[in-house]
């Protein structure tokens, strides 16, 4: 009898957080990351939401920082879904 083996995709939550942090700290890194990384590359759902918000700010030519990111997430009613302001900080 063949057993079904569920395999998790390789992921590193800390690496995901580091990429998002770099995007919030250095606006020059946003364009570079967006060239290489897509939302579906993130494993953690909250990281997907944050990445999408950062991408949206960048596309609108709004400087990405913690304040603008929190504001954007609040506008989209997604801040609490990702863990609130404490998770962003």
Predicted regions and their residues:
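Noncatalytic partner-interaction/assembly domains of nucleic-acid and motor enzyme complexes
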Residues: 1-89
